């Protein structure tokens, strides 16, 4: 099984894979899900998936949850799909591992 993220140490950037469930009761990252043998972090978002509202809430939630600037978080794949690839810029690998380990149960 592959990892759900890739880290580039020269650019201090990470690509993370998420399975997003919009229109949820709360914003929450809850462990992993495997789809076609590919791992994804599960992300529930309160916003509805209309006119980019859920995508905007994803960025806001991750920025607040991980104490990052919104400008360092970008959805680069899956804008209209529940499977998303998100780019995190200017992140230290140790801090990324700390974040990741908090979701491994």
UniProtKB/Swiss-Prot annotation:
Q: Which domain of life is it from?
A: Bacteria
**SUPFAM superfamilies xrefs:** YggU-like
Question: Which InterPro entries does the record match to this protein?
Answer: DUF167 (IPR003746), YggU-like_sf (IPR036591)
Q: Name one GO cellular component term.
A: cytoplasm
HAMAP family assigned: UPF0235
Concerning its family, UniProt says: Belongs to the UPF0235 family.
UniProt cross-references to NCBIfam families, sorted A to Z: DUF167 family protein, PRK01530.1
Name the UniProt record assigns to this protein: UPF0235 protein RAF_ORF1191
